[in-house]
Amino acid sequence: MIYEERLTLTHSKSAEEYLEYCQTDRLEQLRAAGGEPICLLSGLIGDPANQYLQITAYEDVQAWEQAQAKLLPAPADLVESETARLMRPIASRPKPVVPQADRRAVYGCRRFFINPADLSDFVDSSENGIWPRIESQGACILGLWTTVATTQPMEILLLTGYHSPTHWEETRVTSRQQEGVDQDLRQ
């Protein structure tokens, strides 16, 4: 699988209209072109509310290229700027199909910049260290990706789902909510 990360900044007064366009037209266009939308997220804390992050899965690069020929660009009167790039999964997430039970109301989007030589340690620490602890608290890892191109430093994208901003806070190591977490998972 290959994934497209699309960052769209709408005109400040067009955010709601862009979201409606995605829900009524764009997501269906993606599916008809062979893509599988994984998520469409907007800024809540940190990123502006009129910035959208969309992750779409494709069978391979050829399927992505074929889809580009079929897709129409977003309406110019809604979009101020847009970038897209290909990402590859580097861990056990994303799952081939993300079940509804794994969907969350709020997602944390984190970007890490690491030395490519440290990738296997980074993935191991994520999958066997951090993820079991926060998943035991109800969080759900949507995916861990890096760019298709090899770069120095290597950029890593992590999307983690939470039930609410309060739930996110409860999963922090410094939170008082940590008292009920299996101490073996905190090691």
Q: Where are these predicted regions, by residue range?
A:
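Glycine-rich beta-strand-turn "strand-cap" elements at beta-sheet edges
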Residues: 36-50, 72-105, 137-157, 180-187
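Short acidic, gly/pro-rich beta-turn/loop elements at beta-sheet edges
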Residues: 16-18, 64-66, 94, 120-122, ...
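A generic short-segment signal for beta-strand/edge and adjacent turn/coil regions
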Residues: 7-8, 20-26, 75-82, 111, ...
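Hydrophobic, helix-prone linear segments
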Residues: 1-4, 14
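Short, well-ordered beta-strand segments in beta-rich or mixed alpha/beta enzyme
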Residues: 3-9, 39-69, 104-113, 145-146, ...
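Short acidic/polar capping segments at secondary-structure boundaries
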Residues: 89-92, 113, 117
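Short amphipathic alpha-helical segments
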Residues: 14-38, 71-74, 118-144, 176, ...
